[in-house]
Structures are given as structure tokens and as C-alpha cells.
UniProtKB/Swiss-Prot annotation:
Pfam families: FMO-like
Organism: Aspergillus terreus (strain NIH 2624 / FGSC A1156)
Gene3D superfamilies given in the database record: FAD/NAD(P)-binding domain
Similarity-based family: Belongs to the FAD-binding monooxygenase family.
Purpose of the protein: FAD-binding monooxygenase; part of the gene cluster that mediates the biosynthesis of azaterrilone A and other azaphilones, a class of fungal metabolites characterized by a highly oxygenated pyrano-quinone bicyclic core and exhibiting a broad range of bioactivities. The first step of the pathway begins with the non-reducing polyketide synthase tazA that assembles one acetyl-CoA starter unit, five malonyl-CoA units, and catalyzes a series of Claisen condensations, methylation, PT-mediated cyclization, and finally releases the first hexaketide precursor through the R-domain.
Protein name (Swiss-Prot/TrEMBL): FAD-binding monooxygenase tazF
Binding site for NADP(+): 84-86, 212-218, 235-236
Cofactor note: Binds 1 FAD per subunit.
UniProt-listed InterPro entries: FAD-bind_Monooxygenase_sf (IPR051209), FAD/NAD-bd_sf (IPR036188), Flavin_mOase-like (IPR020946)
Site (Transition state stabilizer): 334
Known EC number: 1.14.13.-
Length: 561
């Protein structure tokens, strides 16, 4: 009968060694594996913790390469005035290190970075990290079944290799300048929100802020009070929402509040009470998804509430209401809480501008409304959201990720890419980043990756690569199910991509809930992968038919009871 086994490049048995029974080796004896993770932000640190403390595997040699001088990722890079997290702080933690000492319900970026540094030191997570090192390219070598890596450290280029490669750089790590003529000609100070200069004194300056996404909504009210003037240039209006989980705030309306010293002491003294409080917050964060279902009662309530609040906050400037309130469904762009943002734009020294920026001059802007001079241009213009890694990736058979994902990224449950063996991604395309805490998503993905690492090591596997058919079918499911959600409703947002012959395809959001994502990743689901073994017999890893513990002096011969 005809075979239905894979005939892809690399499945050739010439790559394997002939199998011969080894009567001295117990079954499931793990082989040594080298695992390299790129990035020491939340993802890399979670992986480091699991391998050192929660799931130690003495057969794994972990190395983490970090381009910066310190851990932290997003929270190391983003230091602009007002930077903070709009997810409630009790939920924005490493799951293994709840923090009873948060100062507020929604905390600033500096406090989050200090928490990351403190946690890293407490658990000794730096020992596997190499700093100031950038991955330039990764190429799969079929003969050795390893990733060949080229890296750069302080101007020196060197090579490395690994059995398993993990991308922990995140989807919002490659910031970008706006595509405006004359950007390089500006003689004043030019900053990006993701590359802010904390030494620069912006007080008393004439400031232009380009953009009105999440960063701009934090930046504008922080700069406005001490600016000589501030103009916020806006291409598309955005919903300025209340903070997440408003019902858990003091006033029930999402206003931030400080935890009292008595509350923090109670959190420290009563772990069970603190756990129940954190669970209540986590529950609230996870219910946000229902508000993202187009036409749902929860979505209608959110729309009416936020529109009413925006009209109320703009009551003194009725001329701005139609310009500032969008006509697309709320949530189509990322919900952007903006305490003080609308108020700042109504101050005497500030205003929004909807004029098109034709070009940047040495002294400021030339727009449809004329010329205007500035001392500082602050670009809150976002990131490269193509999901193409910041390094060149060449997989099996010469497949290139930058080519295959040029128009539309397509992954397997935000974690694997077809044609790229032994390669895993944190927060890849179609990840559940639209609600819930990203820390939990990373936790679930890390377990899934380590399940594969353990399987590869203990079953003498040469390579695992998700099938093209699995990626195709998952993305077809995602495309259809995401039509239920507001993210697909045609607004201008980084969540989606416009491709030839197709409507907007949502590439950033998972087609379901974080809970749904977690349950799916609880199992490896190897039927969706091409698995190749090191020997010609796929059951070679069974060894001599015994377990190692059976020959140990105090081996538990009834461990299953």
C-alpha cells in the first residue's frame, strides 16, 4: 500500500544512523541538548526560571543571548515620561513571584523594571545570559540537525550552534521612525518613545508628538504640563478607554489608586487572601475577551460607556468631539486607556492636529495648514509588526522566514513556523495578546516548548517541524473565527494586514481566549509535526526495555501507586 509518510527534505534515512539494540542503555535515557533563546525579557527569564527551578533538566544546556546590557526587554527599552502598564499590577507578574509591594493598581514602567531586576537576582536567572550580543542570522543545517548561528558582540562576529532555537524577542521590539520626508533634516531633538533619552530636558520646549496609540496616550499628558507648547499630530482617531478592570478600582470607573501600607502588609502576611485577590483580578482581566466580540451585549456596553465618557471629557470642546471619537467599532484598534490625555489636549498650551505632515523641515513641520516650529519631535509611531525576526532565518530546504512572512505571517498557535525545525517563538503571530496578562501567555508557551525539549531529548529525536498543512488549517480557522471579533472590522491597526485579493487578515490576535490557548498547548499534539529520529528505528529510544530506576539501589519499583 502507498506510504503517507513525509517526503520533505531531511526525512531521508541517509541522515540517520543504523539502529542496533543497546542492551546496556535503559529506555528514555535523555541525550544532551543545547537550547539557545534570543532575548532576556519576560520570555527568556521565564524560560530560565523554569529550567533552573520548576523543571530542571540536567541534560539541557541553556544559553540566552541578549542584545542589551541588562534584562527587562520592553521595560528596559521604554523609559519615556508616563510609561506604564494598563494591565492591573496584581496580574502583571511572573507567576512564580507574586508581588505584594506594588505601589499602585496600574504601575509605571520604572517600577516594573525594578521588579524584574529584583526577581532576576532573587532566582539567579542571569547565569545563563550573555549580554550585549545580537543574533545576526540563523541557518538550519540538515546534516547536523542543528541551527548554525552567527552573532555579534561589541563589534566581534562569532559563531555558535544549537539543537533548539527559541525566539524571545517579542512582537514589539523593533521600533520604527515615521515615513516622513525630511526626518533626518530636523535640527532640534528627535526622539522615539521606545528610544527616549532620559537625560534630555524637555521642559519649556515646543513639542510635537506624532501618533495617538498607547504610548502617545501616556506621553502627551506627561509632557503637556511643563511644555511651552504641545501639538499632537493624529492621522486616525482612537478610542480613549477606561483602564482594564475598572470595577476593581476604588471608584469603580478605572481611576488608578495607591495601595495603602496596611493593604500591602496584609498581602504579605496572608498569602491565601492575597492569592484570592490576585485570582479575582486575573478573572477580571480574562473576561475582557467578551467585550471584543462584535455585536455582543458586553461590546455594546463598552462602546456606550467609553463614548459617553469621551463626550463628557470633551464637553468644553464640542468642536473636537467628531474629530476625536472614532466611527469604527471600539476595540478594533488596541484599547488605549488614557488618563488625562483628552484633558491635556484641551489645555491652553496644547492642541490636537489632524493636518497631514507633508515634510519635516530643519525647524519643524510643513503641513497642509502651514509651517510650525518645534524644539522636540517625539515619535510615538510604533513598531515593525511584521513578525519577521530581527535576524535572518533560513530553514529547511533554504526556506526564508522574511520571504514567507513578507505579506502575511502564518504560524502554528503563535509558537511554531512551518519549515523551521526545532524552532519555537514566544508571542508569535495570532497570540492571545488582546486580553489577559502576557506573562501568563508566556508561561503557557514556555511549558509547551519545554515539553518538546524533553520529548526530543528522551526519545532520541533528530528534529521536529510543524507541518505546512497544520499551519494552513490553523490559519484558515483563525481567519474565519476572528470575523466574530472587532479586530477584523476594518480599522487602521497593526493587528491586521491587507493582502492582495483578501480582506484585512488579523495576524496579531488569537482566535479565542487565553484559556482556550492554554488548554490547547497543554498537549504537544505531535500529529501536527514531522518528527525525524536519529536512528533508523523510531523506537530506538526504548533502549533495553527497562527504566533507569530499576537498576538503582533505592529505585521505586511501584512509583505508579
Amino acid at each position: 500500500m502507498p506510504s503517507n509518510e513525509s517526503t520533505c527534505l531531511g526525512s531521508d534515512r541517509n541522515m540517520q544512523t543504523a539502529w542496533k539494540l543497546n542492551a546496556s542503555t535503559p529506555g528514555f535515557t535523555p541525550k544532551k541538548l543545547r537550547v539557545v533563546c534570543i532575548g532576556a525579557g519576560l520570555s527568556g527569564l521565564t524560560l530560565a526560571y523554569k529550567l533552573k527551578h520548576e523543571r530542571p533538566m540536567d541534560f539541557v544546556d541553556l544559553r540566552i543571548y541578549e542584545k542589551n546590557h541588562e534584562v527587562g526587554g520592553t521595560w528596559l527599552d521604554n523609559v519615556y515620561p508616563g510609561v506604564g502598564c494598563d494591565i492591573p499590577s496584581p496580574s502583571y507578574v511572573f507567576p512564580f513571584e507574586p508581588n505584594p509591594d506594588w505601589s499602585k493598581f496600574y504601575v509605571g514602567g520604572a517600577e516594573i523594571q525594578q521588579y524584574i531586576l529584583r526577581t532576576t537576582a532573587k532566582y539567579g536567572l542571569k547565569e545563563r545570559i550573555v549580554f550585549n550580543t545580537r543574533l545576526l542570522k540563523a541557518e538550519w543545517n540538515e546534516d547536523s540537525a542543528k541551527w548554525k548561528l552567527q552573532l555579534e558582540q561589541d563589534g566581534r562576529v562569532f559563531d555558535d550552534e544549537t539543537d533548539v532555537l527559541i525566539n524571545g524577542t517579542g512582537c514589539l521590539s523593533q521600533w520604527k521612525w515615521p515615513d516622513i520626508e525630511g526626518l533626518d533634516c530636523f535640527k532640534g531633538k528627535l526622539l522615539h518613545s521606545a528610544r527616549w533619552d532620559p537625560e534630555y530636558n524637555w521642559e519649556g520646549k515646543r513639542i510635537a508628538v506624532i501618533g495617538n496609540g498607547s504610548s502617545a496616550l501616556q506621553l502627551v499628558p506627561s509632557l503637556q504640563p511643563k511644555a511651552a507648547k504641545l501639538v499632537n499630530y493624529i492621522r486616525h482617531p482612537t478610542w480613549v478607554s477606561v483602564n482594564f478592570c475598572p470595577d476593581l478600582t476604588r471608584d469603580g470607573m478605572g481611576s488608578n489608586f495607591e495601595f495603602t501600607e496596611e493593604e500591602k502588609q496584609q498581602f504579605r502576611d496572608d498569602p491565601e487572601m492575597f492569592f484570592q485577590y490576585r485570582k479575582k483580578v486575573e478573572h477580571g482581566v480574562n473576561t475582557v475577551l467578551q467585550m471584543m466580540i462584535s455585536g455582543s451585549g458586553e461590546h455594546k456596553f463598552l462602546h456606550e460607556t467609553v463614548e459617553g465618557l469621551m463626550r463628557q471629557r470633551l464637553a468644553d470642546r464640542p468642536d473636537l468631539i467628531d474629530k476625536m471619537i472614532p466611527n469604527y467599532e471600539i476595540g478594533c484598534r488596541r484599547l488605549s486607556p488614557g488618563d488625562g490625555y483628552l484633558e491635556a489636549l484641551q489645555a491652553a498650551n496644547a492642541r490636537p492636529s489632524f493636518a497631514n505632515i507633508n515634510r519635516i523641515t530643519p525647524t519643524g513641520f510643513e503641513t497642509d495648514e502651514g509651517e510650525e516650529e518645534f524644539d522636540l519631535i517625539a515619535c510615538a509611531t510604533g513598531f515593525n509588526t511584521s513578525y519577521i525576526p530581527p535576524f535572518k532565518m533560513t530553514g529547511r530546504g533554504g526556506r526564508r522566514l522574511d520571504v514567507e512572512w513578507k505579506d502575511k505571517p502564518a504560524a502554528y498557535f503563535a509558537t511554531c513556523a512551518a519549515g523551521f525545525p526545532n524552532y519555537f517563538i514566544f508571542a508569535g503571530p495570532n497570540a492571545p495578546i488582546g486580553h489577559g496578562s502576557v506573562n501568563r501567555m508566556i508561561w503557557f508557551q514556555a511549558d509547551y516548548m519545554l515539553n518538546w525539549v524533553e520529548k526530543i531529548a528522551t526519545e532520541d529525536i533528530r528534529s521536529v517541524a510543524v507541518k505546512d498543512s497544520a499551519v494552513r488549517d490553523f490559519n484558515e480557522f483563525a481567519k474565519e473565527n476572528l470575523k466574530r471579533f472587532v479586530w477584523s472590522k476594518g480599522c487602521h491597526a497593526w493587528y491586521s494586514k491587507k493582502t492582495d485579493g483578501e480582506d484585512n487578515i488579523v495576524t496579531a490576535m488569537y482566535p479565542g481566549s487565553l484559556l482556550h490557548f492554554k488548554v490547547y498547548l497543554d498537549k504537544i499534539r505531535g500529529e501536527h509535526f514531522d518528527i525525524q529520529y536519529n536512528t533508523s528505528n523510531m523506537f530506538g529510544f526504548l533502549g533495553n526495555g527497562e527504566l533507569a530506576l530499576e537498576r538503582e539501589k533505592d529505585g521505586d519499583m511501584a512509583f505508579y501507586m
